[in-house]
Amino acid sequence: MIQNESYLVAADNSGAKVLRVIRVLGGSHKQFGTIGDIVVCSVREAVPNTDIKKGDVVKAVVVRTKKEIRRPDGSYIRFDDNAAVVLDKFNQPKGTRVFGPVARELREKGFMKIVSLAPEVW
């Protein structure tokens, strides 16, 4: 579960390293976000000499969470970290690579570009 002030690892090569959630988008009082949700984040750490700087406000989609999510078949999936991929204004990934596994739920939410860039889909 991702909420305001949660820290996320950037799972792409956009230039951000660590993100802090400002707001979970979707609904007027949406408190928690999970895999496939879009969040507004502040960049807390960034790679030098890239477009994204520390303090920038960006949109990102959550691709991994420590909190397990239940699938329709009754199985559960959870990951070792909370991670997100930085998005541009068209909700496409800003980076050209995605690191680590991503959840299959991203395909159902319409993030096909992220699924195709990921090394493995769980």
Curated annotation (Swiss-Prot):
The keyword Ribonucleoprotein applies. It comes from the Bacteria. GO terms for cellular component: cytosolic large ribosomal subunit. Disulfide bonds: none annotated. Part of the 50S ribosomal subunit. Forms a cluster with proteins L3 and L19. In the 70S ribosome, L14 and L19 interact and together make contacts with the 16S rRNA in bridges B5 and B8. HAMAP family: Ribosomal_uL14. This is Large ribosomal subunit protein uL14. The gene is rplN.
